Amino acid sequence: MNSYKEEILQTKSDFTLKNLIFFAISTLCYKRALFNENCYKKVNFEIEHFKGADFDCQLKPTVVSLQAGVDKEADSFLEMMKTYIFSLVSMKVPFTVYLIISSQCKSILEDDAVEKEIFSFTINPGSEEKICCESFVSYQRSERFVIKLFLSGNVKTECKDEEKVVQIITKMERFQLSKGEATKAGVFLNTVETKDCMSWLNRGEFKDIVSFYESNNGIAISHCSHAFVPISTEKIMINKESSLFDSQEKIDSQLEKFLQPLKYDEIGSTQILDEQSVEKSLSQGKCEKMQNESRGLREIKNNNPCEEVKKSNWLKKNISGSDKVDKAEKKKALLNCECGDSTEDSEMFQCERCDGWVHCACYGFESDSDPRQPNQLLCYTCLLVDSESSLYDRMTMLVAYRRAIRCIWASEYQGFQKLAARLNCSYADAKRIEERLVNENIIYKEKKRKWIYFTNKSPEMVSYLREKYFTPSRWISHLNFQNYRQENQRVNMRSFLRPERMEVIERPKKVSKTSNTKETDTMKPLRI
Protein backbone atom coordinates (compact mmCIF):
# COMPACT_ATOMS: atom_id res chain seq x y z
CA MET A 1 0.00 0.00 0.00
CA ASN A 2 2.82 2.38 0.82
CA SER A 3 4.58 1.66 -2.47
CA TYR A 4 1.38 2.47 -4.34
CA LYS A 5 1.21 5.90 -2.66
CA GLU A 6 4.84 6.62 -3.52
CA GLU A 7 4.21 5.87 -7.20
CA ILE A 8 1.28 8.28 -7.21
CA LEU A 9 3.38 11.03 -5.64
CA GLN A 10 6.22 10.52 -8.12
CA THR A 11 3.84 10.61 -11.07
CA LYS A 12 2.29 13.82 -9.76
CA SER A 13 5.74 15.37 -9.29
CA ASP A 14 6.81 14.43 -12.83
CA PHE A 15 3.62 15.88 -14.24
CA THR A 16 4.20 19.14 -12.37
CA LEU A 17 7.77 19.48 -13.61
CA LYS A 18 6.72 18.74 -17.17
CA ASN A 19 4.07 21.43 -16.95
CA LEU A 20 6.54 23.90 -15.50
CA ILE A 21 9.01 23.44 -18.35
CA PHE A 22 6.34 23.25 -21.01
CA PHE A 23 4.48 26.37 -19.86
CA ALA A 24 7.70 28.37 -19.38
CA ILE A 25 8.99 27.71 -22.92
CA SER A 26 5.52 28.20 -24.41
CA THR A 27 5.11 31.54 -22.65
CA LEU A 28 8.48 32.80 -23.91
CA CYS A 29 7.57 31.79 -27.46
CA TYR A 30 4.21 33.51 -27.09
CA LYS A 31 5.68 36.79 -25.81
CA ARG A 32 8.07 36.91 -28.77
CA ALA A 33 5.48 35.83 -31.36
CA LEU A 34 7.61 32.93 -32.58
CA PHE A 35 4.72 30.86 -33.91
CA ASN A 36 1.19 31.39 -35.15
CA GLU A 37 -0.94 33.13 -32.54
CA ASN A 38 -3.59 30.42 -32.88
CA CYS A 39 -1.10 27.83 -31.57
CA TYR A 40 -1.30 29.15 -28.02
CA LYS A 41 -3.95 28.41 -25.42
CA LYS A 42 -4.28 30.30 -22.15
CA VAL A 43 -3.95 28.16 -19.02
CA ASN A 44 -4.71 28.87 -15.38
CA PHE A 45 -1.33 28.38 -13.75
CA GLU A 46 0.26 30.13 -10.80
CA ILE A 47 3.04 32.49 -11.84
CA GLU A 48 4.80 31.96 -8.50
CA HIS A 49 6.37 28.78 -9.84
CA PHE A 50 8.52 30.82 -12.25
CA LYS A 51 11.45 33.14 -11.59
CA GLY A 52 12.87 35.68 -14.02
CA ALA A 53 12.27 39.03 -15.69
CA ASP A 54 9.73 37.61 -18.12
CA PHE A 55 7.70 36.12 -15.26
CA ASP A 56 7.42 39.14 -12.98
CA CYS A 57 4.32 38.97 -10.79
CA GLN A 58 3.75 42.72 -11.08
CA LEU A 59 3.52 42.52 -14.88
CA LYS A 60 1.01 39.66 -14.63
CA PRO A 61 2.18 37.76 -17.72
CA THR A 62 -0.16 35.40 -19.52
CA VAL A 63 0.81 31.75 -19.15
CA VAL A 64 0.04 29.73 -22.28
CA SER A 65 0.69 26.28 -23.70
CA LEU A 66 1.55 25.28 -27.26
CA GLN A 67 -1.20 23.43 -29.10
CA ALA A 68 -0.62 20.94 -31.90
CA GLY A 69 -2.35 20.88 -35.26
CA VAL A 70 -2.15 24.58 -36.19
CA ASP A 71 1.42 25.37 -37.26
CA LYS A 72 3.85 22.80 -38.70
CA GLU A 73 6.91 24.40 -37.10
CA ALA A 74 5.18 24.50 -33.73
CA ASP A 75 4.19 20.84 -34.11
CA SER A 76 7.77 19.79 -34.85
CA PHE A 77 9.13 21.86 -31.98
CA LEU A 78 6.46 20.45 -29.67
CA GLU A 79 7.18 16.84 -30.60
CA MET A 80 10.92 17.23 -30.01
CA MET A 81 10.39 19.04 -26.73
CA LYS A 82 8.10 16.30 -25.45
CA THR A 83 10.42 13.55 -26.64
CA TYR A 84 13.65 14.78 -25.07
CA ILE A 85 12.78 17.14 -22.24
CA PHE A 86 10.09 14.94 -20.74
CA SER A 87 12.37 11.92 -20.97
CA LEU A 88 14.96 13.71 -18.82
CA VAL A 89 12.25 14.62 -16.31
CA SER A 90 11.26 10.98 -15.96
CA MET A 91 14.93 10.03 -15.33
CA LYS A 92 14.95 12.04 -12.07
CA VAL A 93 18.24 13.83 -12.83
CA PRO A 94 19.05 17.54 -12.63
CA PHE A 95 19.46 19.20 -15.98
CA THR A 96 19.36 22.58 -17.69
CA VAL A 97 17.48 23.69 -20.77
CA TYR A 98 18.94 26.49 -22.90
CA LEU A 99 16.57 28.24 -25.29
CA ILE A 100 18.48 30.38 -27.81
CA ILE A 101 16.73 32.77 -30.17
CA SER A 102 18.95 34.24 -32.87
CA SER A 103 18.72 35.96 -36.24
CA GLN A 104 21.16 33.59 -38.00
CA CYS A 105 21.88 29.88 -38.01
CA LYS A 106 25.57 29.61 -38.96
CA SER A 107 27.88 30.35 -36.03
CA ILE A 108 25.18 32.30 -34.29
CA LEU A 109 26.88 32.20 -30.90
CA GLU A 110 30.51 32.71 -31.93
CA ASP A 111 29.84 36.10 -33.49
CA ASP A 112 29.02 38.81 -30.99
CA ALA A 113 27.47 40.97 -33.71
CA VAL A 114 24.71 38.44 -34.30
CA GLU A 115 21.50 39.36 -32.53
CA LYS A 116 20.55 36.65 -30.07
CA GLU A 117 18.78 35.97 -26.82
CA ILE A 118 19.58 33.06 -24.54
CA PHE A 119 17.39 31.66 -21.77
CA SER A 120 18.35 28.99 -19.27
CA PHE A 121 15.93 26.82 -17.33
CA THR A 122 17.42 24.98 -14.36
CA ILE A 123 15.45 21.93 -13.26
CA ASN A 124 16.31 20.00 -10.10
CA PRO A 125 13.75 17.33 -9.18
CA GLY A 126 15.10 16.96 -5.64
CA SER A 127 14.83 20.63 -4.70
CA GLU A 128 11.91 23.02 -4.65
CA GLU A 129 9.76 22.74 -7.75
CA LYS A 130 10.51 26.10 -9.32
CA ILE A 131 11.79 27.08 -12.75
CA CYS A 132 14.53 29.71 -12.82
CA CYS A 133 14.54 31.56 -16.14
CA GLU A 134 17.63 33.72 -16.77
CA SER A 135 18.29 35.86 -19.83
CA PHE A 136 21.95 36.27 -20.79
CA VAL A 137 22.15 38.41 -23.93
CA SER A 138 19.99 41.29 -25.09
CA TYR A 139 18.17 40.70 -28.34
CA GLN A 140 16.76 43.08 -30.94
CA ARG A 141 13.75 41.92 -32.91
CA SER A 142 14.57 40.64 -36.36
CA GLU A 143 12.53 39.27 -39.24
CA ARG A 144 14.30 35.91 -39.14
CA PHE A 145 15.18 33.87 -36.13
CA VAL A 146 16.56 30.50 -35.13
CA ILE A 147 15.45 28.60 -32.04
CA LYS A 148 18.13 26.42 -30.45
CA LEU A 149 17.23 24.24 -27.52
CA PHE A 150 20.11 22.69 -25.56
CA LEU A 151 19.49 20.03 -22.94
CA SER A 152 22.23 18.94 -20.56
CA GLY A 153 21.93 16.36 -17.81
CA ASN A 154 24.10 14.00 -15.80
CA VAL A 155 23.02 10.41 -16.40
CA LYS A 156 24.49 7.92 -13.92
CA THR A 157 25.69 4.62 -15.36
CA GLU A 158 27.50 1.63 -13.91
CA CYS A 159 30.92 2.69 -15.23
CA LYS A 160 31.04 6.46 -15.10
CA ASP A 161 28.97 9.59 -15.44
CA GLU A 162 28.24 10.60 -18.99
CA GLU A 163 26.93 13.96 -20.05
CA LYS A 164 24.39 13.92 -22.85
CA VAL A 165 23.50 16.95 -24.89
CA VAL A 166 20.54 17.22 -27.21
CA GLN A 167 20.48 20.09 -29.68
CA ILE A 168 17.19 21.04 -31.29
CA ILE A 169 17.11 23.70 -33.99
CA THR A 170 13.98 25.14 -35.54
CA LYS A 171 14.65 27.54 -38.41
CA MET A 172 11.86 29.63 -39.89
CA GLU A 173 10.69 33.11 -40.80
CA ARG A 174 9.55 35.32 -37.96
CA PHE A 175 5.79 35.37 -37.44
CA GLN A 176 4.55 38.95 -37.21
CA LEU A 177 1.22 39.45 -35.52
CA SER A 178 0.66 42.81 -37.20
CA LYS A 179 0.89 41.51 -40.76
CA GLY A 180 -0.10 37.92 -40.11
CA GLU A 181 2.76 36.45 -42.12
CA ALA A 182 4.35 33.05 -41.70
CA THR A 183 6.77 30.97 -43.74
CA LYS A 184 7.53 27.29 -43.66
CA ALA A 185 11.02 26.03 -42.89
CA GLY A 186 12.98 22.93 -41.99
CA VAL A 187 13.52 21.33 -38.63
CA PHE A 188 16.85 19.69 -37.77
CA LEU A 189 17.66 17.39 -34.90
CA ASN A 190 21.09 16.56 -33.55
CA THR A 191 22.26 14.29 -30.74
CA VAL A 192 25.83 14.39 -29.41
CA GLU A 193 27.44 12.56 -26.51
CA THR A 194 30.52 14.50 -25.43
CA LYS A 195 31.83 16.66 -22.61
CA ASP A 196 33.71 19.13 -24.78
CA CYS A 197 30.45 20.68 -25.95
CA MET A 198 29.47 21.70 -22.45
CA SER A 199 32.79 23.23 -21.37
CA TRP A 200 31.34 26.70 -21.90
CA LEU A 201 28.62 26.06 -19.32
CA ASN A 202 30.97 26.26 -16.34
CA ARG A 203 32.82 29.37 -17.56
CA GLY A 204 29.85 31.11 -19.12
CA GLU A 205 31.80 32.03 -22.26
CA PHE A 206 29.71 32.06 -25.39
CA LYS A 207 32.69 31.89 -27.76
CA ASP A 208 33.24 28.23 -26.78
CA ILE A 209 29.68 27.17 -27.41
CA VAL A 210 28.82 24.61 -30.04
CA SER A 211 28.30 26.05 -33.53
CA PHE A 212 26.00 24.56 -36.13
CA TYR A 213 26.56 24.59 -39.87
CA GLU A 214 25.73 22.62 -43.01
CA SER A 215 28.49 20.76 -44.87
CA ASN A 216 28.64 18.52 -47.92
CA ASN A 217 28.54 15.42 -45.73
CA GLY A 218 25.43 16.60 -43.90
CA ILE A 219 25.15 18.50 -40.64
CA ALA A 220 28.33 19.15 -38.67
CA ILE A 221 28.99 20.38 -35.16
CA SER A 222 31.97 22.51 -34.19
CA HIS A 223 33.26 21.80 -30.69
CA CYS A 224 35.30 24.15 -28.54
CA SER A 225 38.41 22.17 -29.52
CA HIS A 226 37.73 23.11 -33.19
CA ALA A 227 37.03 19.48 -34.11
CA PHE A 228 34.23 18.70 -36.53
CA VAL A 229 31.90 15.76 -36.16
CA PRO A 230 29.98 15.13 -39.41
CA ILE A 231 26.56 13.57 -39.02
CA SER A 232 24.49 12.15 -41.85
CA THR A 233 21.34 14.01 -42.76
CA GLU A 234 19.22 10.85 -42.57
CA LYS A 235 19.79 10.56 -38.82
CA ILE A 236 18.90 14.18 -38.25
CA MET A 237 15.47 14.20 -39.85
CA ILE A 238 12.76 12.95 -37.54
CA ASN A 239 10.65 9.98 -38.47
CA LYS A 240 7.53 11.71 -37.19
CA GLU A 241 8.14 14.66 -39.48
CA SER A 242 6.87 12.78 -42.51
CA SER A 243 3.47 12.33 -40.89
CA LEU A 244 3.08 16.09 -40.58
CA PHE A 245 3.15 16.57 -44.34
CA ASP A 246 1.31 13.43 -45.46
CA SER A 247 -1.88 15.36 -46.12
CA GLN A 248 -0.04 17.87 -48.31
CA GLU A 249 1.76 15.23 -50.37
CA LYS A 250 -1.48 13.56 -51.43
CA ILE A 251 -2.48 14.74 -54.90
CA ASP A 252 -5.69 13.55 -56.48
CA SER A 253 -5.22 10.98 -59.22
CA GLN A 254 -6.78 13.05 -61.97
CA LEU A 255 -4.44 16.01 -61.52
CA GLU A 256 -1.43 13.77 -60.93
CA LYS A 257 -2.11 12.04 -64.24
CA PHE A 258 -2.27 15.40 -65.97
CA LEU A 259 0.92 16.66 -64.33
CA GLN A 260 2.99 13.77 -65.64
CA PRO A 261 5.12 14.61 -68.72
CA LEU A 262 2.97 14.33 -71.81
CA LYS A 263 3.67 11.99 -74.73
CA TYR A 264 3.19 13.28 -78.22
CA ASP A 265 0.48 11.14 -79.82
CA GLU A 266 -1.46 11.66 -83.00
CA ILE A 267 -4.10 14.36 -82.98
CA GLY A 268 -7.71 13.29 -82.74
CA SER A 269 -8.84 16.54 -84.28
CA THR A 270 -12.44 17.66 -84.23
CA GLN A 271 -11.72 20.98 -85.91
CA ILE A 272 -10.72 21.79 -89.47
CA LEU A 273 -6.94 21.86 -90.01
CA ASP A 274 -4.77 22.37 -93.03
CA GLU A 275 -2.79 19.34 -94.18
CA GLN A 276 0.49 21.23 -93.97
CA SER A 277 -0.14 22.37 -90.41
CA VAL A 278 -1.07 18.83 -89.30
CA GLU A 279 2.07 17.32 -90.86
CA LYS A 280 4.20 20.07 -89.37
CA SER A 281 2.78 19.59 -85.87
CA LEU A 282 3.16 15.79 -86.01
CA SER A 283 6.75 15.98 -87.23
CA GLN A 284 7.55 18.57 -84.59
CA GLY A 285 6.02 16.36 -81.89
CA LYS A 286 8.00 13.30 -83.00
CA CYS A 287 11.27 15.25 -83.00
CA GLU A 288 10.64 16.59 -79.52
CA LYS A 289 9.76 13.11 -78.29
CA MET A 290 13.04 11.70 -79.61
CA GLN A 291 15.07 14.54 -78.11
CA ASN A 292 13.63 14.49 -74.61
CA GLU A 293 10.78 12.19 -73.69
CA SER A 294 10.51 13.36 -70.10
CA ARG A 295 10.14 17.05 -70.92
CA GLY A 296 7.18 19.03 -69.72
CA LEU A 297 4.21 20.41 -71.58
CA ARG A 298 6.13 22.83 -73.73
CA GLU A 299 9.67 23.57 -74.85
CA ILE A 300 11.25 25.38 -71.94
CA LYS A 301 12.29 28.85 -72.90
CA ASN A 302 15.56 28.77 -70.98
CA ASN A 303 16.76 25.65 -72.82
CA ASN A 304 16.66 27.35 -76.22
CA PRO A 305 20.25 28.56 -76.86
CA CYS A 306 19.37 30.58 -79.95
CA GLU A 307 16.79 32.54 -78.03
CA GLU A 308 19.22 33.23 -75.20
CA VAL A 309 21.88 34.46 -77.63
CA LYS A 310 19.40 36.83 -79.26
CA LYS A 311 18.27 38.03 -75.85
CA SER A 312 21.81 38.67 -74.61
CA ASN A 313 22.82 40.40 -77.85
CA TRP A 314 19.75 42.60 -77.67
CA LEU A 315 20.55 43.63 -74.11
CA LYS A 316 24.23 44.30 -74.85
CA LYS A 317 23.35 46.35 -77.91
CA ASN A 318 20.84 48.51 -76.09
CA ILE A 319 22.87 48.95 -72.93
CA SER A 320 26.04 49.87 -74.82
CA GLY A 321 24.17 52.26 -77.11
CA SER A 322 22.29 54.11 -74.41
CA ASP A 323 22.37 53.90 -70.64
CA LYS A 324 18.64 54.45 -70.31
CA VAL A 325 16.74 51.47 -71.68
CA ASP A 326 13.02 51.72 -72.14
CA LYS A 327 11.29 50.04 -69.20
CA ALA A 328 8.63 48.43 -71.36
CA GLU A 329 11.17 46.85 -73.74
CA LYS A 330 13.38 45.74 -70.86
CA LYS A 331 10.40 44.19 -69.09
CA LYS A 332 9.42 42.36 -72.26
CA ALA A 333 12.98 41.10 -72.72
CA LEU A 334 13.08 39.77 -69.15
CA LEU A 335 9.66 38.12 -69.31
CA ASN A 336 10.50 34.61 -68.21
CA CYS A 337 7.22 32.92 -67.31
CA GLU A 338 7.20 29.13 -67.65
CA CYS A 339 3.82 29.15 -69.39
CA GLY A 340 5.46 30.07 -72.71
CA ASP A 341 3.24 33.09 -73.32
CA SER A 342 5.33 36.18 -74.03
CA THR A 343 2.31 38.48 -73.73
CA GLU A 344 2.46 41.01 -70.92
CA ASP A 345 -0.31 41.37 -68.37
CA SER A 346 -1.22 44.25 -66.14
CA GLU A 347 -0.67 41.98 -63.12
CA MET A 348 2.78 40.40 -62.97
CA PHE A 349 5.44 39.50 -60.41
CA GLN A 350 9.21 39.87 -60.65
CA CYS A 351 11.56 37.15 -59.44
CA GLU A 352 13.93 38.31 -56.72
CA ARG A 353 16.83 36.22 -58.04
CA CYS A 354 16.79 36.41 -61.85
CA ASP A 355 14.68 39.60 -62.21
CA GLY A 356 12.41 37.78 -64.65
CA TRP A 357 8.72 38.68 -64.89
CA VAL A 358 6.00 36.04 -64.46
CA HIS A 359 2.22 36.18 -64.68
CA CYS A 360 0.33 36.27 -61.39
CA ALA A 361 -2.31 33.79 -62.55
CA CYS A 362 0.34 31.31 -63.72
CA TYR A 363 1.56 30.97 -60.14
CA GLY A 364 -1.91 30.55 -58.66
CA PHE A 365 -2.45 34.15 -57.58
CA GLU A 366 -5.68 35.84 -58.59
CA SER A 367 -4.14 39.33 -58.73
CA ASP A 368 -1.02 41.24 -57.80
CA SER A 369 -2.77 42.27 -54.56
CA ASP A 370 -3.36 38.67 -53.48
CA PRO A 371 -2.66 38.44 -49.71
CA ARG A 372 -1.12 34.97 -50.17
CA GLN A 373 1.87 36.31 -52.10
CA PRO A 374 5.24 35.95 -50.33
CA ASN A 375 7.51 38.85 -49.51
CA GLN A 376 10.19 37.57 -51.88
CA LEU A 377 8.81 35.57 -54.78
CA LEU A 378 11.08 33.22 -56.71
CA CYS A 379 10.12 31.79 -60.09
CA TYR A 380 9.87 28.03 -60.52
CA THR A 381 13.06 28.01 -62.58
CA CYS A 382 15.15 29.47 -59.75
CA LEU A 383 13.26 27.50 -57.12
CA LEU A 384 13.02 24.00 -58.59
CA VAL A 385 15.17 23.51 -61.70
CA ASP A 386 18.27 22.46 -59.74
CA SER A 387 16.80 20.82 -56.64
CA GLU A 388 13.54 19.28 -57.89
CA SER A 389 13.77 18.75 -61.64
CA SER A 390 10.87 16.29 -61.86
CA LEU A 391 8.61 18.61 -59.91
CA TYR A 392 9.75 21.48 -62.13
CA ASP A 393 8.46 19.66 -65.23
CA ARG A 394 5.08 19.06 -63.61
CA MET A 395 4.77 22.62 -62.34
CA THR A 396 5.58 23.87 -65.85
CA MET A 397 2.59 21.96 -67.17
CA LEU A 398 0.40 23.31 -64.40
CA VAL A 399 1.54 26.85 -65.21
CA ALA A 400 0.52 26.39 -68.85
CA TYR A 401 -2.90 25.11 -67.82
CA ARG A 402 -3.41 28.06 -65.47
CA ARG A 403 -2.47 30.40 -68.29
CA ALA A 404 -5.04 28.76 -70.55
CA ILE A 405 -7.75 29.27 -67.93
CA ARG A 406 -6.72 32.91 -67.51
CA CYS A 407 -6.87 33.54 -71.27
CA ILE A 408 -10.26 31.95 -71.86
CA TRP A 409 -11.65 33.78 -68.83
CA ALA A 410 -10.63 37.14 -70.26
CA SER A 411 -11.73 36.31 -73.82
CA GLU A 412 -13.70 33.43 -75.27
CA TYR A 413 -11.90 30.27 -76.34
CA GLN A 414 -10.93 30.44 -80.03
CA GLY A 415 -9.61 26.94 -80.71
CA PHE A 416 -6.47 25.00 -79.89
CA GLN A 417 -4.58 26.42 -82.89
CA LYS A 418 -4.51 29.91 -81.38
CA LEU A 419 -3.92 28.44 -77.93
CA ALA A 420 -0.84 26.60 -79.23
CA ALA A 421 0.47 29.79 -80.81
CA ARG A 422 -0.03 31.70 -77.59
CA LEU A 423 1.53 29.11 -75.26
CA ASN A 424 4.35 28.34 -77.72
CA CYS A 425 3.56 24.61 -77.71
CA SER A 426 2.60 21.99 -80.30
CA TYR A 427 -0.93 21.34 -81.54
CA ALA A 428 -0.94 17.99 -79.75
CA ASP A 429 -0.32 19.62 -76.37
CA ALA A 430 -2.88 22.35 -77.04
CA LYS A 431 -5.41 19.68 -77.99
CA ARG A 432 -4.80 17.89 -74.69
CA ILE A 433 -5.40 21.13 -72.81
CA GLU A 434 -8.63 21.65 -74.74
CA GLU A 435 -9.84 18.14 -73.89
CA ARG A 436 -9.15 18.72 -70.22
CA LEU A 437 -11.01 22.04 -70.28
CA VAL A 438 -14.01 20.28 -71.81
CA ASN A 439 -13.87 17.35 -69.38
CA GLU A 440 -13.87 19.70 -66.41
CA ASN A 441 -16.76 21.69 -67.93
CA ILE A 442 -14.69 24.88 -67.96
CA ILE A 443 -15.65 25.36 -71.61
CA TYR A 444 -18.73 23.91 -73.29
CA LYS A 445 -20.72 23.99 -76.51
CA GLU A 446 -24.37 24.67 -77.15
CA LYS A 447 -26.53 22.44 -79.29
CA LYS A 448 -27.43 25.14 -81.77
CA ARG A 449 -23.86 26.41 -82.18
CA LYS A 450 -21.54 23.44 -81.87
CA TRP A 451 -18.61 25.22 -83.50
CA ILE A 452 -18.34 27.84 -80.74
CA TYR A 453 -17.03 27.27 -77.22
CA PHE A 454 -18.45 29.18 -74.25
CA THR A 455 -16.77 29.69 -70.88
CA ASN A 456 -18.53 28.44 -67.77
CA LYS A 457 -18.34 31.37 -65.34
CA SER A 458 -20.80 30.12 -62.77
CA PRO A 459 -20.12 30.63 -59.02
CA GLU A 460 -19.68 26.87 -58.64
CA MET A 461 -16.97 26.85 -61.31
CA VAL A 462 -15.21 29.81 -59.66
CA SER A 463 -15.05 28.00 -56.33
CA TYR A 464 -13.89 24.82 -58.09
CA LEU A 465 -11.01 26.59 -59.86
CA ARG A 466 -9.94 28.40 -56.71
CA GLU A 467 -9.80 25.20 -54.72
CA LYS A 468 -8.07 23.05 -57.31
CA TYR A 469 -5.78 25.29 -59.35
CA PHE A 470 -5.47 28.77 -57.85
CA THR A 471 -3.94 27.85 -54.51
CA PRO A 472 -0.31 29.03 -54.81
CA SER A 473 1.41 26.75 -52.30
CA ARG A 474 -0.74 23.65 -52.73
CA TRP A 475 1.66 21.57 -54.80
CA ILE A 476 4.94 22.72 -53.23
CA SER A 477 3.99 23.24 -49.58
CA HIS A 478 5.13 19.73 -48.61
CA LEU A 479 8.67 20.59 -49.74
CA ASN A 480 8.84 23.27 -47.05
CA PHE A 481 10.16 26.12 -49.21
CA GLN A 482 10.77 29.29 -47.28
CA ASN A 483 9.53 31.78 -49.85
CA TYR A 484 5.94 30.46 -49.90
CA ARG A 485 3.88 31.28 -46.87
CA GLN A 486 1.01 29.42 -45.33
CA GLU A 487 -2.41 30.00 -46.79
CA ASN A 488 -4.10 33.05 -45.33
CA GLN A 489 -7.82 33.41 -45.06
CA ARG A 490 -9.42 34.67 -48.21
CA VAL A 491 -10.46 38.31 -48.08
CA ASN A 492 -12.22 40.61 -50.46
CA MET A 493 -9.65 41.35 -53.13
CA ARG A 494 -9.42 42.11 -56.82
CA SER A 495 -9.59 38.90 -58.84
CA PHE A 496 -10.04 37.88 -62.45
CA LEU A 497 -12.10 34.86 -61.32
CA ARG A 498 -15.48 36.48 -61.13
CA PRO A 499 -18.77 34.79 -61.86
CA GLU A 500 -20.69 36.06 -64.84
CA ARG A 501 -23.41 38.54 -64.01
CA MET A 502 -26.72 37.54 -65.46
CA GLU A 503 -28.51 40.63 -66.68
CA VAL A 504 -32.25 40.40 -66.09
CA ILE A 505 -34.21 42.19 -68.78
CA GLU A 506 -37.65 43.29 -67.71
CA ARG A 507 -39.99 42.73 -70.58
CA PRO A 508 -43.19 44.82 -70.86
CA LYS A 509 -46.31 43.06 -69.82
CA LYS A 510 -48.81 42.17 -72.48
CA VAL A 511 -51.92 44.32 -72.44
CA SER A 512 -55.16 42.67 -73.44
CA LYS A 513 -56.83 44.55 -76.21
CA THR A 514 -60.44 45.25 -75.31
CA SER A 515 -62.91 47.55 -76.99
CA ASN A 516 -64.61 50.03 -74.75
CA THR A 517 -67.63 51.95 -75.85
CA LYS A 518 -67.96 54.05 -72.74
CA GLU A 519 -65.38 56.73 -72.11
CA THR A 520 -64.30 56.98 -68.49
CA ASP A 521 -61.66 58.91 -66.59
CA THR A 522 -59.39 55.91 -66.09
CA MET A 523 -59.75 54.19 -69.43
CA LYS A 524 -59.74 55.78 -72.85
CA PRO A 525 -61.35 54.20 -75.91
CA LEU A 526 -59.06 52.20 -78.17
CA ARG A 527 -58.29 53.62 -81.58
CA ILE A 528 -59.00 51.16 -84.34
UniProtKB/Swiss-Prot annotation:
The keyword ATP-binding does not apply. Pfam families: HORMA, PHD. Residues 11-212 form the HORMA domain. InterPro entries: HORMA_dom (IPR003511), HORMA_dom_sf (IPR036570), Zinc_finger_PHD-type_CS (IPR019786), Znf_FYVE_PHD (IPR011011), Znf_PHD-finger (IPR019787), Znf_RING/FYVE/PHD (IPR013083). A zinc finger (PHD-type) spans 334-385. One of its GO terms (biological process) is reciprocal meiotic recombination. Disruption phenotype: Decreases DNA double-strand break formation during meiosis and meiotic gene conversion at ade6. Decreases localization of rec15 and rec10 to DNA double strand break (DSB) hotspots, and decreases localization of rec15 to chromosomal axis sites. Abnormal sporulation. Zn(2+) 1 binds at C337, C339, H359, C362. GO terms for molecular function: DNA binding; ubiquitin-like protein ligase activity; zinc ion binding. Zn(2+) 2 binds at C351, C354, C379, C382. Residues 516-528 have a biased composition (Basic and acidic residues). Gene3D superfamilies: HORMA domain (3.30.900.10), Zinc/RING finger domain, C3HC4 (zinc finger) (3.30.40.10). Keywords: Chromosome, DNA-binding, Meiosis, Metal-binding, Nucleus, Zinc, Zinc-finger. It is found in: Nucleus; Chromosome. The keyword Cell wall biogenesis/degradation does not apply. Residues 507-528 are annotated as: Disordered. Facilitates initiation of meiotic recombination and DNA double-strand break (DSB) formation at DSB hotspot sites by enhancing the interaction between rec10 and rec15. This is Linear element-associated protein hop1. It comes from Schizosaccharomyces pombe (strain 972 / ATCC 24843). The gene is hop1.
